[in-house]
From Swiss-Prot:
Keywords: Cytoplasm, Oxidoreductase. Pathway: Sulfur metabolism; hydrogen sulfide biosynthesis; sulfite from sulfate: step 3/3. GO terms for molecular function: phosphoadenylyl-sulfate reductase (thioredoxin) activity. GO terms for biological process: hydrogen sulfide biosynthetic process; sulfate assimilation, phosphoadenylyl sulfate reduction by phosphoadenylyl-sulfate reductase (thioredoxin). Belongs to the PAPS reductase family. CysH subfamily. This is Phosphoadenosine 5'-phosphosulfate reductase. SUPFAM superfamilies: Adenine nucleotide alpha hydrolases-like (SSF52402). The active site is at C239 (nucleophile). It is an enzyme of class 1 (oxidoreductase). Catalyzes the formation of sulfite from phosphoadenosine 5'-phosphosulfate (PAPS) using thioredoxin as an electron donor.
Length: 244
């Protein structure tokens, strides 16, 4: 597999671009997560960044990637509505792993947003999507541009939701390479990795949370619920960062 140059690949006719990505993904599927990362650093172009929501199992990707590239920028899009436990978790992991944390926020503060728009998360799917655009999508786009990203690592997994079940390891999204090295991991593998490397779950894991985002759109898991139903009142799974 030869090196991938983003601008060259983006300039190809769509069919050729898809064929090149498909062949790369076919080979990447046979590799371990560690080997996938090595391949990415050896073959993908541009600056590398890693995004993290500092969710329940976030320590896995943070540890896995920073072992390969200690100073990689770690992007957090901070809505201002994260759980207190999440902010403390961010502080703890940043210190433990010596993270190069880069925090991006919306142009308007949470209080100003509420004054202007009301509580967008209480305004149905349209309100949630507008909230996500303001607090997640725009700050992430700005982060990718500011950090001159060419390759974006993320910790999405196929077993997390239906919307992620067919995602490839390598794609082009938002004009950069999107690379998902643990896409085929399950909860068991995640658990063993955390234990092997003495890494913590998010503190709310012990209180019954399977997924953690903002305080106003996150629910504890209850019997009969899917993980998807614990976020955004079950109306949608994605916060916008990993769509489109």
């Amino acid at each position: 597999m030869s090196a991938f140059h983003l601008e060259t690949l983006k300039s190809l006719p769509k069919a050729e671009q898809e064929a090149a990505l498909s062949e790369a993904n076919r080979q990447l599927e046979e590799m371990s997560a560690e080997d996938r990362l090595k391949w990415a650093f050896d073959n993908l172009s541009g600056q590398f960044v890693l995004s993290s929501s500092f969710g329940i199992q976030a320590a896995v990707m943070l540890h896995l990637v920073t072992r390969k590239k200690a100073d990689i920028p770690v992007i957090l899009t901070d809505t201002g509505y994260l759980f207190p436990e999440t902010y403390r978790f961010i502080d703890a992991l940043t210190e433990k792993l010596d993270l190069n944390l880069q925090v991006f926020r919306a142009a308007l503060s949470p209080a100003w947003q509420e004054a202007r728009y009301g509580k967008l998360w209480e305004q149905g799917v349209e309100g949630i999507e507008r909230y996500n655009d303001i607090n997640k999508v725009e700050p992430m786009n700005r982060a990718l541009k500011t950090l001159e990203a060419g390759t974006w690592f993320a910790g999405l997994r196929r077993d997390q939701s239906k919307s992620r079940s067919h995602l490839p390891i390598l794609a082009i999204q938002r004009g950069v390479f999107k690379f998902l090295p643990i896409i085929d991991w399950d909860n068991r593998k995640i658990h063993y990795y955390l234990k092997e490397h003495d890494l913590p779950y998010h503190p709310l894991w012990d209180e019954g949370y399977l997924s953690v985002g903002d305080t106003h759109t996150t629910r504890k898991w209850e019997e009969g619920m899917s993980e998807e139903e614990t976020r955004f009142f079950g109306l949608k799974r994605e916060c916008g960062l990993h769509e489109g």
